[in-house]
Amino acid sequence: MSLLTEVETYVLSIVPSGPLKAEIAQRLEDVFAGKNTDLEALMEWLKTRPILSPLTKGILGFVFTLTVPSERGLQRRRFVQNALNGNGDPNNMDRAVKLYRKLKREITFHGAKEIALGYSAGALASCMGLIYNRMGAVTTEVAFGLVCATCEQIADSQHRSHRQMVTTTNPLIRHENRMVLASTTAKAMEQMAGSSEQAAEAMEVASQARQMVQAMRAIGTHPSSSAGLKDDLLENLQAYQKRMGVQMQRFK
């Protein structure tokens, strides 16, 4: 796996799924391929994106700044600086300075990532802030190692939280989660349908599922009543995709 592929993988792991994630993935690919060289426009676009947390925006802004060639005097962006200040916690800043001293002696991506993984996400973000504000300089490879370690820490905590939700025994949360997943699967079917011959069938199935979810939410149902809803919808989606010759990997 190339360095930039690895960076893209880690960064996208902390972006919530949805159309915005696809858009960000495209922007990252363009930046890494040298196709997008307007850092100012890129940062303005990033700043106004909804849904993303300030920290995720800060990390993306840091990656764009590292990758896109720009004039030396280009102004640093406040939204990135605020996100990478470690919540203003002096402990984070102390640890960030210690980490920075170690990273300065490092030259490889993997070496930097290994060192950085021993620190908290707050300290890692603060260290990124030091580099972003030009208070410290490391090689691009080392900076990318720091980015990936930060994303790994964040993704780990997101995964723990997600696992808690998936394994929860609370029937109301499970029921709502199944209905949300059914709705997003329906949306995926509608997006994939496009103008194909089977489009009408896919749209019909998706539309029925949405109506069912809306009805269940409006009248209230027993928490076990949604158990088969998502599975039925996924089965229909798989059958539809097989006929269309589309690979299932992306939807597993």
UniProtKB/Swiss-Prot annotation:
Report the main location listed first in the record.
virion
Q: Which SMART domains match?
A: Flu_M1_C
Pfam families, alphabetically? Flu_M1 (PF00598), Flu_M1_C (PF08289)
Q: Which domain of life is it from?
A: Viruses
Question: What's this protein's family per the entry?
Answer: Belongs to the influenza viruses Matrix protein M1 family.
Record's InterPro entries? Flu_matrix_M1 (IPR036039), Flu_matrix_M1_C (IPR013188), Flu_matrix_M1_N (IPR001561), Flu_matrix_M1_N_sub1 (IPR015423), Flu_matrix_M1_N_sub2 (IPR015799), INFV_M1 (IPR037533)
UniProt source species = Influenza A virus (strain A/Japan/305/1957 H2N2)
Q: What name does UniProt use for this protein?
A: Matrix protein 1
Please explain the role this protein plays, according to its UniProt record. Plays critical roles in virus replication, from virus entry and uncoating to assembly and budding of the virus particle. M1 binding to ribonucleocapsids (RNPs) in nucleus seems to inhibit viral transcription. Interaction of viral NEP with M1-RNP is thought to promote nuclear export of the complex, which is targeted to the virion assembly site at the apical plasma membrane in polarized epithelial cells. Interactions with NA and HA may bring M1, a non-raft-associated protein, into lipid rafts. Forms a continuous shell on the inner side of the lipid bilayer in virion, where it binds the RNP. Determines the virion's shape: spherical or filamentous. Clinical isolates of influenza are characterized by the presence of significant proportion of filamentous virions, whereas after multiple passage on eggs or cell culture, virions have only spherical morphology. Filamentous virions are thought to be important to infect neighboring cells, and spherical virions more suited to spread through aerosol between hosts organisms.
Q: Does the keyword Nucleotide-binding apply?
A: no
Alphabetically sorted, this entry's keywords are:
Host nucleus, Membrane, RNA-binding, Viral matrix protein, Virion
Which SUPFAM superfamilies is this protein grouped with?
A: Influenza virus matrix protein M1
Upper lineage = Viruses, Riboviria, Orthornavirae, Negarnaviricota, Polyploviricotina
Q: Which Gene3D superfamilies match?
A: 1.10.10.180, 1.20.91.10
